[in-house]
């Protein structure tokens, strides 16, 4: 029986490239001359830390980072951006978490979405991925289009397609 897996993964190499590109853009921006502004990647915690001198500049840093992430093929909704900034002395900072894997709650939403659509496929939650199995390729492709069309707040990839 044909099957595929729904996963949510980010390539850390691409994230590293996006952060380096954002730092390069930051060094050439006129409005950041003479300002202490840093974009750092922490690969262990899978997070990006933005630090600068004002709240407005912090929002500008986020825009620069999102722009370079999109250029590298990383969807902006795979970044978990907190709404409020931390304030330490004269510096403002935000720690942006990277969304890796599908949490159990999100996997249940995907399973419910597919089952409610009456497509003749079965879903199984397997750790941080959802396996979808069906009798025909057309049913699987319909399930892929359904998940792509749903606004679930996280990007998904479809891999391990077996016939």
From Swiss-Prot:
Transmembrane segments: none annotated. Keywords: Nucleotide-binding. GO terms for molecular function: nucleotide binding. GO terms for cellular component: cytosol. The keyword Nucleotide-binding applies. Belongs to the YajQ family. Nucleotide-binding protein. This is Nucleotide-binding protein APJL_1242. It comes from Actinobacillus pleuropneumoniae serotype 3 (strain JL03).
């Amino acid at each position: 029986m044909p099957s595929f897996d729904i996963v949510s993964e980010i390539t850390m190499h691409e994230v590293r490239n996006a952060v380096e590109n954002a730092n390069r853009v930051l060094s050439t921006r006129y409005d950041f001359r003479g300002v202490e502004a840093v974009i750092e990647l922490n690969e262990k915690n899978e997070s990006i830390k933005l630090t600068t001198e004002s709240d407005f500049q912090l929002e500008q840093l986020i825009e620069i980072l999102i722009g370079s992430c999109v250029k590298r093929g990383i969807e902006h909704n795979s970044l978990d951006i907190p709404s409020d900034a931390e304030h330490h002395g004269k510096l403002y900072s935000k720690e942006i978490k990277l969304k890796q894997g599908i949490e159990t709650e999100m996997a249940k939403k995907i399973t419910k979405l597919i089952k409610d659509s009456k497509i003749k496929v079965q879903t199984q939650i397997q750790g941080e991925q959802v396996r979808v199995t069906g009798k025909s390729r057309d049913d699987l492709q319909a399930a892929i289009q359904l998940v792509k069309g749903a606004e679930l707040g996280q990007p998904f990839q479809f891999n391990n397609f077996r016939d």
